[in-house]
Amino acid sequence: VLQKYAVRAGGGVNHRMGLDDAVLIKDNHLAYCGSIAQAVRQAKQAVGPLTCVEIEVDTLAQLNEAIAAGAERILLDNMDDETLKEAANRCHTQTAHPHTVYCEASGGIGFNRLKRVAQTGVDGIALGYLTHSSRSLDIGLDFVA
């Protein structure tokens, strides 16, 4: 929780504060459900219309399925910059209403690549690096006798 607070204090936006904020469908869920369409359908039935359903994809073919299935948010995982650019374009043009699918780049994005990823047209960038790679401050207390 402290890492999430630090991100907000630094001007960032947290993806989710808890597991109940939104549904995030990942590869294990897809393996269980059998297809992207089935996973999205089951998630929407389980949580109702007010909870956002997001799905993680790592190919353009999966992206097309996720858009067709009606996912509101798509996490573009471990894609190179050119693929991200194409994916963002599809998210913004292959839907019934432009920009109804929020696309977020994720996976392997550090500060050295951040600007290039931002220029691909994605709506957001997930930087797990901010929270899972931060070093703790070494604080000690010495008593003098």
Stretches with model-predicted labels:
Residues 78, 107, 129-130:
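Short secondary-structure boundary segments
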Residues 94-100:
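Intrinsic disorder/low-complexity segments
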Residues 141-145:
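A short, gly/pro- and small-residue-rich
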Residues 80-84, 95:
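Low-complexity, compositionally biased segments
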